[in-house]
Every structure is written in structure tokens, then in C-alpha cells.
Swiss-Prot record:
Primary role: Directs the termination of nascent peptide synthesis (translation) in response to the termination codons UAA, UAG and UGA. Modulates plant growth and development.
Cited PANTHER family: PEPTIDE CHAIN RELEASE FACTOR SUBUNIT 1 (PTHR10113)
Family of the protein in this entry: Belongs to the eukaryotic release factor 1 family.
Source species taxonomy: Eukaryota, Viridiplantae, Streptophyta, Embryophyta, Tracheophyta
Gene that this polypeptide is encoded by: ERF1-3
Additional comment: Plants silencing ERF1-3 show increased elongation of the leaf petiole.
Protein name: Eukaryotic peptide chain release factor subunit 1-3
Keyword Protein biosynthesis annotated: yes
Compartment(s) where it occurs, according to its Swiss-Prot or TrEMBL record: Cytoplasm
Modified residues (N-acetylalanine): A2
Main subcellular location: cytoplasm
This protein's GO CC annotations: cytoplasm
A Pfam family it matches: eRF1_2
Amino acid sequence: MADQESDKSIEIWKSFKLIKGLESARGNGTSMISLIMPPRDQVARVTKMLADEYGTASNIKSRVNRQSVLSAITSAQQRLKLYNKVPPNGLVLYTGTIVTDDGKEKKVTIDFEPFKPINASLYLCDNKFHTEPLNELLESDDKFGFIVMDGNGTLFGTLSGNTREVLHKFTVDLPKKHGRGGQSALRFARLRMEKRHNYVRKTAELATQFYINPATSQPNVSGLILAGSADFKTELSQSELFDPRLQAKILNVVDVSYGGENGFNQAIELSAEILSNVKFIQEKKLIGKYFEEISQDTGKYVFGVDDTLKALDMGAVETLIVWENLDINRYELKNGATGETVIKHLGKEQENDQSNFHDAESNAELEIVEKMPLLEWFANEYKRFGCTLEFVTNKSQEGSQFCRGFGGIGGLLRYQLDMRTFDELSDGEVYEDSD
């Protein structure tokens, strides 16, 4: 199933698209209401405030503007009636009359609970929607794990934004190397190795305890940094005792001069650049894995809109990879003559070709029932196909190659699939209903 990290990045992307759409909307006069309520605010307080605002707005001299403002306040009041209390993450409400691209007026009302708590309170009537407070939703709150390990002990910590937290630390008393000769030398060496092994095992077990969420069995951090002054950190990273789910999350192994909290601070400084580029690194890793499947011709990959959608329908896609600026729209078209509905995915050039909006056999015109960016459709529907959805940029070399060479859409599959077989089947129209 889709992991939490992937879900969160999709929510951020949805919020970004919504904010951009709201930002560009404009209205006549001051008939556009922006209302943001933080968690634990009272619906009754805002309802009373809107009633007071209604009284004030009744005195606006311009009849057209007065009616627009009163209409927007009424819409806000009606929408608030749907809520008994403010949702746990707060409530965002935008309502008013906007002017569309072709100069027509259109009423819009958008209300939603943000995907994480919003710490802002706002009420404004203007000729635009105010989305500035929503920008905090777009800020990454990725959490990173740190394991600082040396010959004296280990510290487990996390870093999220500028907040660092020490989860646990313990000390260890390891025997030092010494020059005693004779038969005791081997025994001492064996004891020393045994204690080292136990130390690494304890650290590995605690790492699983702190950095794996027991509810999801997935890491609760976006990445791991291993730090230390001796070679314990390297030993841990390569150890079979270290949880493979965490091994996959290692971003960096750094040398620090100290152990404990001083070592933690130094590790944060030394990893600053890597942490700021973590999305970039994850993207390179993901697309690198995709290219590896292709170069080895494993059959566990798919690319292009049609093949990717076929594989999705079969439940074969484990990770759906899509360029964040993919410019393809999903059309639901209806044949007026037969009542049949078809789905088409068209790019800009294809949209200009009118033959795509006519039935190939009868030349009957196809009516547009729904038009939606394919990206948006994926963001809403991906969970239905049991896959994770990853948006990638074209800023890395790998990302650019994925967009140019593979059309910016593809997937890693759960099992081997030869899409050519399916193309031949569909060409032969084997999928026709027998009844």
C-alpha cells in the first residue's frame, strides 16, 4: 500500500495546485471572502462575526458590490452550517464571485480541512483570495533520524526543520586493545569481538524500535544519517543485524570528532547539504531503479500513458512515476448517437486535432462530459489501484531523461509483464464482450 511519506507529498502537491488556482482568481469589487480557522477555534464565534459583517455590508453604497458581498457572506454562512465544530486540522473556506477568462461571472465556494494543522486565523473581503497563510502547508516537515555511535556509546535523535530531539542515549564499556601476549591474547580478542558484536546488535535493535512505526511496519523518518568517530557506524550500516528497511533509508555516513550531543550537532552541520537535497536524492534513486529495470529488461517496468494505465487497471503497478508538469488531460467523451462513453488522454497537439472528438466509424461528434488534468486524476485515484504515486521533476539528469525519453509517465511493476502481448490482444479485439 501507499506509504505515508508518498501520501504526504501528494497532499502537498494537491494543496500547491489548489493555492495556485485560488491565487490567480480575481473578482469585481470586494466580494471574495477568505476565511481560515485554526484548530480549536469556535464555529459559533465565526458565525456571529459573519452576522455582524452582514449588517455592516448592508450599508455599502454601490448596489452591485453590496449584493455581491452579501451573497458571499450568505454562502460562507451556509457552508459553515455543515460543520458542528472546527475539524482537528482547522478549516479553510473561500467563497465569492470570480471573473472567468472569458469575462463571465461565476460563483465559487471551496472549503476543506488542511492535511496538517494550520496555525493561522484570517477573515478578509477583497477582490482576490488571500492564500498566504496556506503556504505553511507546502513547507516540508520531513523528519530525519540520526545515530551517533562511537566506542563510548550511542545516541538516537531526530531532526525536523530546525527542531532536534534526542530520543535515547546509552553508554557502553568496551574492553580496549592491549598487548598482553601468550595464550590469553586470543581469549581477550574473542571477548572484545563478542562485546563489539553485542553493542552493534543492541544499537540495531534500538534503531528498529525508534525509527520503524509498528502500526505501518514502515520507517517513520525520511532518511537516516549514521555518524561517529570510529568505524562502528560503518560496521552498523553493513551489518546483517541492521533492519533492511532502515538500511534503504541511509542518506549519509559521516565522521564526527565527538560522541553524544556534540557529535549529533556536528553530524547535523555536516549533513546540511544532503538533507536540503533529500527530495533530489530520492528522485535520482527512484528513477535510477526504474532505468535499471529497463536496462536489464526485467519486464517489471512500463512507460507511456496507454501501457501505464493498462498495467494500473490490472493492479500490476507498485510505484507510479509521473512528471509533476505532465501536460495531458483526461477526457470523458460521450457519443450522442450511441450513448457510449469513451476515455481519451490527450496532449496539447492532440487537443487541436478535431478528429479526436469525433467517432472514427460514424464521424459522430463526441460530447465532452468531463475534462481533467491527468495528474489531478492520478492524485485522486492512485490508492484505488493499490500503488504509490511519486511526482518527479526534470531538474536532475535522470528526471530530464525520464521526461524526454519516456514521456514523463511510467511505473515499476509488482511482477513481470509483457505489454506487447496485451497490445497484440487489443489489436485483435479479443476484449470484445461475447454477449
